[in-house]
Amino acid sequence: MLLGGSSMPRPLTLGDYTLLPDTVHRQWYVNLNEDDLSDSLQHILSEEVQRHYPGWGIIVTSLPVIAINECEGESISRYEEAHITIQLTDVRCQTQGQYYYTSTARAHWRGVTASTLEKKSYSLKLTDAADDDLDAPLLGLQEGHTFILDAMAADLGRMRNRLCFDLWNEVSTLRDSDMVANGTRGHYVELLLNGSYHGVYCLCEKVNRKLLGLKKYKVDDSADDGSQASPYRGHLYKCSRGDDLTSYLALPEDYTESSTTEWYGWDLEYPDEYPSTEAWHPLIDLFQYTMAEDTAQTLDLERLSHHFQTDNFFEYPLFNFACKMMDNAMHNTYISFRNYHKDSIAWITPWDLDGSFGRDGTSWDNSIYTASEGLSLGWVRPYRSLHDRRDSTFMAELAIRWDRWRTATFAVEHVCQHIDSMAGILVNSGAWQREVERWDSLNVMYAGIGPLHLEADLTTETTMMKEWYERNFANLDARFLPYLPQPSAITTITADAPRGMTEDHWYDATGRAIASPLSNGIYIHNGQILIRKR
């Protein structure tokens, strides 16, 4: 088959390694463990390359390498899928235990604004020989047929989206074992596109029914009362526009229903093959609640629990404040219902988090701003009114969670270490230098703002991110800690605490050290088990 409009050389296998070609620059890319990046091994591989392909060089990287080649006559675009081939090398053998994995696939550009950049992001759909969907656990991610190659082109650090998702996945509550994650996982890779080096990307999962554990659309013979049961169970909606009233979880006065996959500022992501007015009812019903709660005198947790997963409801805005999301006031956000037959509990899942940590989605430097200047959740109901009137219940629930997060996932040291770790992966693999050489020479305009210049020294960007976070951390302390409930009504149970716990320290029921017992629950302190109820 002719790929990319020209005859492409096959991968080159040298012993245990498979090398992928950059035919434009006459280089072979090989993925090795960091421990194997020795001069002697590289010399051996280089000699073998010269023997097979005189005049070609070798690029050694500790990142997996993906080669995408458009099939002859096909061209990847924004709205039309193109047939492609995918070749993946991974020294950790995370894809079905293989160092080298290959598949056919379909691809298109993803992201409305991001698709205007020369360095595109791609949506991939793996296929078999019959062009049907093919599931595979690429790089050990959730087994499926849809994946995202995130270009991170508007992020001058090439890490914000992945950094934020990693932090979110640490703190986000899971509904049960059927839910793989309430956010995507991903890994850095280096991409070869049609035989030419295309830069560093992040291969990540797509938010979908399988990741969130939503129940499938299914036709039953009858409901419990003998009537015909609705086939709709799990629902997944994506807010695709940030300029629509519905993106603030509110209904227009004269709203109409939809029987398609689009309704005002939202897309029906599942079950997208069965659009109808009924498919939109869970979201409309939720908006009825958020609008009513927006005008209530105080937040009612009991009422809230019938419409949102309670922890998730509070985790989302706090996460938004901690990372200062600039484009996630429900825009770039998913709302899902696992099984609307059983309950009407909604879950919130974030998406596209690159406008964070001191920059917005255009890489404009907004590092002077922290969570104190403006509310990054915009006018979303009921968050804005709860925050602006400093609703005591709302602020206390955020304070309780922030007090827990600030000594663990969102501790300054932990966040800064994560930033340094991601930077180390990019720099030590050589990918950052190649990324700068590939993309900083171009005058890339983004949403009318540009050019975007990458710093050769990545620490310039990471230092800005870390200094911004330290300021934001202090701001969040000042904003939320005054609303911490005072410990009260602590009951002591005569029982021995587990061994190995230090006196004068507080622990939760799982044995994890915490700052203090702030919410109702079981705690361990000074060798005793305590119950707090307020």
Briefly describe each language-model feature range.
Residues 26, 519-523:
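A glycine-anchored, Pro-Gly-centered beta-turn/N-cap motif
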Residues 113, 117, 264, 268-330, ...:
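Middle-to-C-terminal accessory/interaction subdomains
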